[in-house]
Amino acid sequence: MYTNPKQADVYETANKCFYVNTFMKMLNQLFREHNLPEIKVGIGMSTAQELVVKAGRKGVGINSKIWIGKAVSRACHYADHGNKDGNPAIVMGTCSYNNMIDKLVKNNPDRKPKEWFTYHKDEGEGDYYTADIIKIDFDNWIKAGMKID
């Protein structure tokens, strides 16, 4: 759960999704090496105006933030689509996509990032995009055997 008051923050959150996706590839590589079953996860991202409320009990140290709004439920719904029915792990709503894609294109001018995403129509929870984006340097390190110098 991240608060994104600025458009640049939405890009940074998407970037974290790309790292999580790459991390899961590393973790599953380790599992395969030890003949363990792989883990499939869905990574959901949604952006919307939310209400954040602090809830707890006075004097007992319980003081948590609670997010109220569509972004949380949609992110959960999108995560449920990830790595299922032929979808890749990363699933993000159109608002998230629209607020980060220009920066992704700017940071990858020769790589056509818009082609990394597939658009899906969903009347229920809202349209979304799917992708299997990884951090290349991190992935190369995984493929090279995860050696620490």
Question: Can you describe what each PLM-predicted range is?
Answer:
Residues 3, 43-49, 94-96:
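A general secondary-structure junction signal
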